[in-house]
Amino acid sequence: MTLPGGVILVFILVGLACIAIIATIIYRKWQARQRGLQRF
């Protein structure tokens, strides 16, 4: 069973999009934590 290149490309793009969204959420939480530490 071989998948066409287009399907593989779509899977890669979806995977990268999910990683980017997760990385953005983690980065924002980390930034908020850094700001919280600076206040105290």
Swiss-Prot record:
Keywords: Cell membrane, Membrane, Transmembrane, Transmembrane helix. This is Plasma membrane ATPase proteolipid 1. Monomer and homodimer. Associated with the 100 kDa subunit of the plasma membrane H(+)-ATPase. GO terms for molecular function: enzyme regulator activity. It is found in: Cell membrane. InterPro entries: Pmp1/Pmp2. Its main location: membrane. The chain crosses the membrane at residues 3-26. It comes from the Eukaryota. Residues 1-2 form a propeptide. Residues 27-40 are cytoplasmic. Coiled coil: none annotated. GO terms for cellular component: membrane; plasma membrane. Present with 124000 molecules/cell in log phase SD medium.
